[in-house]
Amino acid sequence: MKHFLLILGSLCAASGAIAQTPNPFMSELKQFYTVRKADLLKAADRMPAEDYNFKPTPDVRTFGQLIAHIADAQMSFCSGAKGKPIRLNAAAKTTKADLLASLKASFDECDGVFDATTDVIATQMIKTGNSEHSKFWALLYATLHDNEEYGYLAVYLRLKELIPPSTNSR
């Protein structure tokens, strides 16, 4: 009987701790997003302005084009999740300063959406092109896309003999 009461007490205590964590899905997704956000901003800043036109082979994007792509995609996903799609048009920019400003603007948009999205709100459906997805899907996809693109940026940095931020912080 003592074992049963001990187990029951432990379960009750654990369920209370879980209940105290509001929005566990969005909280965990935001943690992942926040880590990658820091890495992307540091990577964009770390690459010298004169190397924003660098591309390892002729058939891939330049470093600057990757930054623009990240900013444009992020703005699309996050503003779409908010229900008010915004076109950033970072692809039209070429200088490091302008591209960094676009990247920061896309993160500002995403920060607001992540802050306002609870687990319940995340289940709401939104139109994405010809499909419908949950707001959670849009924010998850934005975060996964950031992760993928960061991997490319890390290679570009290494090819320029620069240490990627995620490695540097270890």
What do these predicted ranges mean?
Residues 10, 46, 69-72, 105:
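Residues within well-ordered alpha-helical secondary structure of globular protein domains
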Residues 22, 33, 59, 70-71, ...:
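Generic structural signal for well-ordered secondary structure
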Residues 30-31, 38-41, 51-89, 127-170:
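Short, contiguous alpha-helical
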Residues 46-52, 114-122, 158-164:
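Surface-exposed helix-capping loop/turn segments at secondary-structure junctions
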Residues 1-22:
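Bacterial Sec-dependent N-terminal signal peptides
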